[in-house]
Amino acid sequence: MKQTVYIASPESQQIHVWNLNHEGALTLTQVVDVPGQVQPMVVSPDKRYLYVGVRPEFRVLAYRIAPDDGALTFAAESALPGSPTHISTDHQGQFVFVGSYNAGNVSVTRLEDGLPVGVVDVVEGLDGCHSANISPDNRTLWVPALKQDRICLFTVSDDGHLVAQDPAEVTTVEGAGPRHMVFHPNEQYAYCVNELNSSVDVWELKDPHGNIECVQTLDMMPENFSDTRWAADIHITPDGRHLYACDRTASLITVFSVSEDGSVLSKEGFQPTETQPRGFNIDHRGKYLIAAGQKSHHISVYEIVGEQGLLHEKGRYAVGQGPMWVVVNAH
């Protein structure tokens, strides 16, 4: 299995393409100049395309991924109804979901043979919409509205329209600011990082009909931390044993272990990292974590080690200006 790491740097309007080897070393293979400030990225389920959101002309761009080395070639683009903050797809590769923090909406763009062809639905009134996350069963779209302390729940119809579920939302504690999410591999639990109080909520998916309950909330900061809380990203290892979340003010990654059933998180430690870590990701083997520093203009690679999943730095690399998004593709 070969792995390619993509780093989006909006200030220099670039995507850096890296090969990740078995020892955790990165080799730069391509630098793509993007027509706009590139931020969120996601790989299509069939691994043929990389979708990226750009501003100030709000669009989703599709880049064809070379199967041998992961190199990118521009393929198509489609307009968006707001500045793209987060981008994702359904598991079948039929739709792209884009959350827009500034516009307060989530949009659905239809894909034809992997290429974006146009918006089929937009839901407004999601103040501070920060991500759109499809459930493992491909039925429910979880959409955190950060400024409203709620996660809205939509059923995705066959033609890509979003239908509010009943109940239509779950709420966090006041002032939490739900932001990004991941799901446990067993499909029974979801984890949401809250930006404004730097906590992580564990949500139990009791059934496929929207019966959801918050079963744990954990503070992700050190006990003596008294500065402004400003959490950003969250990811889980493929085996579901280790979960990580980052805070930009403290420039650290919090390490959690996950109980076997996914219901309980335990804080294991903290890893100082690049300055203002806006985004990070984990490779497909669950062996390495790559973090980007929005203010350091570098990325660091860490090896995930031991039962606790602690991080040991393997290397550091210069990228573009203001790197914000990290995606890893296996091919």
UniProtKB/Swiss-Prot annotation:
**EC number of this enzyme:** 3.1.1.31
Q: Which Pfam families match?
A: Lactonase
List of residues that carry N6-acetyllysine: 287
**Family label:** Belongs to the cycloisomerase 2 family.
Q: Which PANTHER family has this protein been placed in?
A: 6-PHOSPHOGLUCONOLACTONASE, 6-PHOSPHOGLUCONOLACTONASE-RELATED
- Fetch the HAMAP family from UniProt: 6P_gluconolactonase
Write the protein's name. 6-phosphogluconolactonase
